[in-house]
Amino acid sequence: MHLSEITHPNQLHGLSIQELKQIARQIRDKHLETVAATGGHLGPGLGVVELTLGLYQTLDLDRDRVIWDVGHQAYPHKLLTGRYDRFHTLRQKDGVAGYLNRKESEFDHFGAGHASTSISAALGMALARDQRGETHKVVAIIGDGALTGGMSLEAINHAGHLPHTNLMVVLNDNEMSISPNVGALSRYLNKMRLNPQVQFITENLEEQIKHFVGDSITPELGRLKGGMKRLAVPKVGAVFEELGFTYVGPVDGHNLEELIATFNAAHKIPGPVLVHVATVKGKGYAIAEKDQVGYHAQNPFNLATGKAMPSSKPKPPSYSKVFGDTLTKLAEADSRIIGITAAMATGTGLDILQKHLPDQYIDVGIAEQHAVTMAAGLACEGMRPVVTIYSTFLQRAYDQIVHDVCIQSLPVLFCMDRAGIVGADGPTHQGMYDIAYLRCLPNMVLMAPKDEAELQQMLVTGINYMDGPIGLRYPRGNGYGVALMEEGWEPLPIGKAEVLRQGDDLLMLAYGSMVYPTLQAAEILREHGIAATVVNARFAKPLDTELILPLAEKLGRVVTVEEGCLIGGFGSAVLEALQDQEILVPVTRIGIPDILVEHATPDQSKAQLGLTSAQIAERVLAKTQQPAPSRV
């Protein structure tokens, strides 16, 4: 059988080990071929090919539920569930999503793009099953560092206290979280654990001894029974046993015979079970095996060399690169500066700080809540913590931002990379909401640069601001190629905007990444006889009302432009300020409406949302041709 013939995972039933190995090779070939062409997550999926095949051969996926953590591990799952013919469209507009999506397939039982959610979701499904008196299996597959997230540990703690709820957790240990040895001893211990006679002895030991000596030594029996149960458990497994799980493993995650035997046996164990599978991230592609962090995810690349496809022309440095370089220079001069990341050093540019000043760098793992409150503690002691995080992941620490930072007005700088449209990763990763969810918080200041040079200024501004927390958002991708400063940066005055273009017909207020597109739109409007004043707002909170309100009243029409959600966003802030002063002028808000933005290139998404320069100009032209509403 060829992989292309598999449209349902139950077709794996009955295949020989040799046939499964052939399917495994075909999965890796298709995975590599596709990601090299489209970009995407490379290492995680390559590491779980045999795990997926072995598990799915032991399940009935017309009934059973499998929940993949994060979702970027699940490319093999997609190839086995009817998406082979469309897999070449991975992460492309209207193509196969890069993460799991309940709308895309009946086998995507739970959507996920953020880490550490699978065990909680699986436990909910298992409890629903039990309520209905059903008997199907529920399996959560977690790993690739996701076990460092507090939510997964909360779920394990809860599930471990439900001895009558059958739930299997498969820990894909690819050395990104924990990594015990795999070998002959481990296989022997695992075999011993699964031996029915050993299980019978450990579960019935107490009753057998009581039969002969009575109840007088019950406390000692409990300790003896616990010791027997832990006899064959590797050290790491004892932790899960103490939390109420039956621990099985570690198992060689690339040995199909061992995986199938282990899963079949583990399915028979009642209650919560954890199967520990040791895998190699990037398995089957030597370049990715050697550089597991670098090949976690890739842009399109040359499969033979592993190198990125050359660009048609040189590109300016990315915002992340400018951020990392600038923060490192500032940290060299100020030992109070501490860069904090939640397992995203390379993506955020903090790997530059890590390399040059490791003592001023902290990686907390996938633990955003901890990162924020730890930063609050650092700020209490006079340090200058810089929490560097993707906009979408900062959502995970909202209570900590409110309770531990804002209420105490602590000087924590939040640097939100990937703010706005991020592209191929889709709705789980769009950075659309940060303006809205942070603007409502007392003591919070919000700013966004128009280009990479202003990013440098704002980074200096944030580090020097001591009156409370400050949020700095900036987009994914490359800057505009403007000249960068090497030193001598001065903080910007808080809450002050700048006028970039003068005109007498209307006021255009742009925030962050939309400043340059708005300037281009103003030029198009000029060609149509409309002269716009363009303001780089710089700050969404506090607004520069001393500048904005008189201009709005004088010019009589306002347009706001932002790369964020319209509900509660920058445009809403402007409307509120105008209303508070009873300045009743027409306001057109341009931004992201109340929809989910699916995976596509950033340019495709912006065109779909009406955020190109030409579309902004068209929207303004359409509005200016309408009579202004009465101010009465």
Swiss-Prot record:
A GO biological process of this protein is: 1-deoxy-D-xylulose 5-phosphate biosynthetic process
- Which residues of this UniProt protein bind thiamine diphosphate? H72, G113, H114, A115, G145, A146, N174, Y285, E368
Catalyses: D-glyceraldehyde 3-phosphate + pyruvate + H(+) = 1-deoxy-D-xylulose 5-phosphate + CO2
InterPro entries, per the entry: Dxylulose-5-P_synthase, THDP-binding, Transketo_C/PFOR_II, Transketolase-like_Pyr-bd, Transketolase_BS, Transketolase_C, Transketolase_CS
UniProt keywords, alphabetically: Isoprene biosynthesis, Magnesium, Metal-binding, Thiamine biosynthesis, Thiamine pyrophosphate, Transferase
- Report the GO terms under cellular component: cytosol
State the needed cofactors, names only. Answer: Mg(2+); thiamine diphosphate
Entry EC no(s): 2.2.1.7
Which pathway does this polypeptide act in? Metabolic intermediate biosynthesis; 1-deoxy-D-xylulose 5-phosphate biosynthesis; 1-deoxy-D-xylulose 5-phosphate from D-glyceraldehyde 3-phosphate and pyruvate: step 1/1
Which positions in this protein are listed as binding Mg(2+)? Answer: D144, N174
Q: Name one Pfam family in it.
A: Transket_pyr
Per its record, what are the GO molecular function terms? 1-deoxy-D-xylulose-5-phosphate synthase activity; magnesium ion binding; thiamine pyrophosphate binding
Source organism's superkingdom?
Bacteria
The task this protein performs is described as: Catalyzes the acyloin condensation reaction between C atoms 2 and 3 of pyruvate and glyceraldehyde 3-phosphate to yield 1-deoxy-D-xylulose-5-phosphate (DXP).
The entry's family comment says:
Belongs to the transketolase family. DXPS subfamily.
Oligomeric state and interaction partners are given as: Homodimer.
- What's the protein name? 1-deoxy-D-xylulose-5-phosphate synthase
